[in-house]
């Protein structure tokens, strides 16, 4: 089951089974965005 939910602000929560991915998009300027992925096991990848 895939659940896509938009939180307050520019963050989107994607839930696949028991795995939750939080995608936070922050526009710092033209062409700049920050994506944050958070997994239940505590690994966070920022790009």
Kindly label every feature range from the protein language model.
Residues 1-47:
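Compact, glycine-rich, soluble single-domain proteins
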């Amino acid at each position: 089951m895939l659940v896509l939910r938009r939180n307050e602000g520019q963050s989107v929560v994607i839930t696949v089974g028991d795995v939750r991915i939080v995608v936070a998009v922050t526009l710092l300027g033209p062409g700049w965005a920050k994506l944050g992925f958070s997994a239940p096991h505590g690994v966070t990848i920022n790009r």
